[in-house]
Structure formats: structure tokens, C-alpha cells
Amino acid sequence: MTSLDQFVTAVIASPSQYTELDRIYVHNRVLGLVGEGDPIAASDDQLTSLTDALVKTAIQNGKIEATQSDEDILADQLMDLVTPLPSVLNQRFWDKYQVSPQTATDYFFNLSKANDYIKTRAIAKNVVFPAKTPFGDLEITINLSKPEKDPKAIAAARNQPQDGYPLCQLCMQNEGYLGRLGYPARSNHRIIRLTLGGNTWGFQYSPYAYFNEHSIFLDQEHRPMVINRQTFTNLLEIVQQFPHYFVGSNADLPIVGGSMLSHEHYQGGRHEFPMMKAPIARTIDLGIAGVKAGIVKWPMSTIRLTSQDLVALTDAAVKIHETWKNYSDESVDVRAYTDGTRHHTTTPIARKVGDDYVLDIVLRDNQTSAEFPDGIFHPHQDVQHIKKENIGLIEVMGRAILPARLKTELAEVGKYLLDQPNQMVAMHQAWAAQLKATNTITADNVTTVIDTAVGNVFARVLADAGVFKWDDAGEAAFDRFVAAMHD
């Protein structure tokens, strides 16, 4: 049996709409995509391996160019054949939801892996390790899964006509979109429709997941990120619908927000982040009945709210957010506005613990200064050799997403520490010299020394992003902010 025949059999056995009667039709659909020359054999009978073989066959037959863009587009067209139509998938999802929310998400998650929408093979390349810090074990990841952009492809994409469709990579217009040079293939992409606050939203998984069951909840309308009462209501509504998932929103301002501020969306999933394990350092009273509140022992300034009353919980979140938006304290460089520009917002995260709903509200400030041009509450220059990008939702919760360059760069730091010939980049010199001076380095412990040091740098990164520091001045300033909520 050829790889093409095996693939057709897999399509018929898949959750798609095809049956044995459709075999000839599906065979001809695949032939049309890959060409009529002899199919290249697959390395095994896994669906992804069969797809790889058919993509190579298409290159051999001159149907596509041997470029990442062409290969991705064809692979996703093939995987579309094993994927139910959006209407069918949505019906099945909500049918399974009647059994339990987890039954529904398990079905959708497994399907999104099986059809290679979630790039499990690429994600497996990521480097992940824990790091002990004064704030508990942080999670360090070096992100190797997202493909590097080919300079030639970037140049070619610049010459492509831009018709603004899809409007952005989070729009529902991406569902089933073929893709093009410089824009990802989405033929096998599916979105579950749900209602939040009376509006239609979508639920999908992230193709390059940063944690288990990494989900995206997106507004059907293309409108900018905003944090307000509706945000808190929506987050709690999602946790009501999917109590086994947490969900949070990136902040709605540059520097402290995520990389996609143009389309309202949230991220969630099934993972207990370090911040969720962090204890309450001291309780506070917000004057809202039925809501417990406390300052979390965490490098970023966080107030944890707990209640079974969703309206009271939302009221408490709004009180913190609205007070913070207009709150300044010059003694600790906290300024709500400069020259009419707003600097304050929050990063909210919701989850359910037993019968309680929990909202963590993280205070954010995106000011810049002559001393800190990238951001006063952003990784400072001396830690930017490890992390200089924005501190978004996932990192706020204690999971570092570090750039791919670090895999090779840290290997060279290791050689330097062992006095071996190396090509260590200059920006790591001061840090590496300090590691050398303060540790007895051996071949057996060099990796542990570096991993621990990277973890400590990430803890410092989070501390830089925290508006109220864990010193006497910072804690007194935090208490003044809490008092301001009673004014």
C-alpha cells in the first residue's frame, strides 16, 4: 500500500465526514494536491509521517516549491481532509459538553493535535526546566518551536499584495484560510463558538503551545484589547463554562501588554503556574462583603481576590483596576499619567479552586525614562542579555518564554565557565564572569549552575516589572495604594 493509499485510509478512519464510499473521491482529491507521480514512502504509518511523505511527493512532482510556506500550506490542506467541518465540530463539541466540560475540551484538544494544528513535534523541541528562586520554583522555557522567518521569504512577502484579509491572525476569518507567503496556513484550523456577555466569541488552541492545553479565546469582532468590567465578567464566565481551565488577559497597553493588542482575546488552559502556588503575604480589606483579598508573595505586585459571589468579585476587581488607573506615588516612581498619556492597567487571571472563584489582579505601569528607555517596570538593561521582550500574561505567572538564541549562547557560556575554547557573545561576559567568581564549576555541575542562574535572572526580570518592590519602601507604598481604595 502506497503512502497515498495509507493516507486515504486514515482520512476515512478519521473524525471527518468521509466514509468508505468516498474512497475514490478522496484519492482523487489528494492526487490533485500532490500530483500523479509515484508517491514517496512514509517513514511510518503515523498521520504526520504520511503527510510529510505526500508533501515530498508534491515537490518531486513539481506541484509545489520546496519552501516552508508552500510545504505548510499543502500539509494543512491534507490535514483539512481529516478534520470535521466547523459546523460538525461545533455540534460534536457541545454534545460532548453535555457529558462534561472536560469531555468536550479533551475531544477538541486531541483532534487539534491529531490534525497537526497544534505543532506537537515542534513544541517537543522546546527546552523546559524548573528553577528554584526566593519566590518558589519558576518555570524556564527556551522557545525553539516557532520556525525562524526565512529572510528571503520576508523579502518576498513584502512584495505580496496586502488586501487586509484576514484582518489579523486572531480573526475568525482564519478558519480554513489557505495561507500565503508571509501568512500562516490555516486550512485545518477550527474554532468553537461560545457566548460571553451576550456576544459571540471563539475558542481555539494555540498552534505553538507554551503550556498544557494552551487556549485562546477571541472576540468575533476585530477590536482592540481593553481591560474593564466586561473583561472581568468575561474571564469569570469562561471559568464557569470550563472550570478545569484558568484564563487571563494580557494588559491593554504597550510594553506591559502582549504582542497582539489589536484584537481582543484571552489565553487559558490547564496548567498550574508558579504564581498560582504562591501564598498570600498579608491579607487586606477592600470593604466588599463576601470577598477575601490579599497581597500575593510574588515579585510582581498582585492582589488575590477569592469569593463564591461573582458580582462581588467583579466589583472588587473593578475597584482595584479603576483606582490603579488614576493612582500615582512619586516616591516609588509610580505615575498614572505623564503629559496626558495613561500608564496604568492590570493583568487579570481567573480560575476556580474548589467552590471558590479566584481573580489575581497584577498591577502594571508602562512608563519609560531616560534611565530606563525600554520601561521603568520592564526588564532592566543588565538582565536583557537573557530577556528583553515584553513581560506578558504567561511570564507574569512565572513561566519564562526565552528566545531561541539562548540555547546556543548558553552552551558557549558553559564552555567559558569550564575554560574551554568558546564563542561566548559579549553581552553575557559580565554575568558569566560573576558566575565563575562565585561558583566552583565542574563538568558535572556546569549545566545546573547556568540553569539556576537563568532562573535567578528571570526572578529579577519579574521583580523589575513589579511596581511595588519587596523592600520597606515598596511594601509601605503598596499599603498606601490599598488605603487609597477606601478614599
UniProtKB/Swiss-Prot annotation:
Q: Can you supply one Gene Ontology CC term for this chain's record?
A: cytoplasm
Q: Which InterPro entries match?
A: GalP_uridyl_Trfase_II, GalP_uridyl_Trfase_II_CS, GalP_Utransf_C, GalP_Utransf_N
**Keywords recorded for this protein, A-Z:** Carbohydrate metabolism, Cytoplasm, Galactose metabolism, Nucleotidyltransferase, Transferase
Q: A GO molecular-function term, please?
A: UDP-glucose:hexose-1-phosphate uridylyltransferase activity
State the reactions this protein catalyses. Answer: alpha-D-galactose 1-phosphate + UDP-alpha-D-glucose = alpha-D-glucose 1-phosphate + UDP-alpha-D-galactose
Subcellular location(s) of the protein: Cytoplasm
Q: Does the keyword Nucleotidyltransferase apply?
A: yes
Family annotation (HAMAP family):
GalP_UDP_trans
Name the chain's protein.
Galactose-1-phosphate uridylyltransferase
Organism encoding this protein: Lactiplantibacillus plantarum (strain ATCC BAA-793 / NCIMB 8826 / WCFS1)
Organism lineage: Bacteria, Bacillati, Bacillota, Bacilli, Lactobacillales
